[in-house]
Amino acid sequence: MTNEPAGLGGLRVLVTRPAHQADTLCRLIERAGGEALRLPLLSIEPMAPALVARQFELARAFDWWIFTSANAVRHARTIDGGAWPGGLAAVGPATAAALEAASGSDVLAPLQGASSEALLARVELQNLSGKRVLIVTGADGLDQLSMELQVRGATVVTVAVYHRVPLPHAADAVEATLKRAKAIIITSGQALEHLLDLTPESARAALLKKQLVVPSGRVVEMAQTLGFAAPALAPEQMSDAAILHCLESWWKPQAQKT
């Protein structure tokens, strides 16, 4: 048995994931010696099922269906119980696992990382001339993915199966939670903007000093533009294990300073 302290000992982490997706990550943080604080910023709500179901029917014979998140898989399967095409792809391993479970089929996924760019690096998606592709995503999904697929010759249809709804929180509760947190896990650019909107002016300067963990380079740049002092951290993927590793790598030298 080791006498070394837990990897996140002394670290309070604010988890802003939707409530139904936060439990496992919070348990991992606490198992590593940290304290997980919860402040869900967005809820994930389904789009009108009748319209979405019609879009799935029209795309039944498409060559590829590409899913951008596990939420997209979950809501798509709730709406559409039919057979999905043989060409299924996912932008990362967590989405791929959800898609394999929902479809019972093999799924094309990035060889490394979790992003549309990583998926687009796969040889199977290089020449799409004459191919039809359905992107299954959330509202305000990955326009860059659609544009690149079209550049490669594909006819692309995008279907949004869910949308994110900002959740209200009392200003004093937000301020009290932020005072305790040293790091904040952010799930999207929309979530980051909403956190800033929720933060009272009296707590804004303190918020901008927090360490952020974000899902992509785009949100890293957004955080910098919004005035966060420390560069945001972007794990290779937003899986629970990758986020935990990212936090531990950052926190170890910080903890040694105290």
Where are these regions (language model features)?
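Signature of uroporphyrinogen-III synthase
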Residues: 1-258
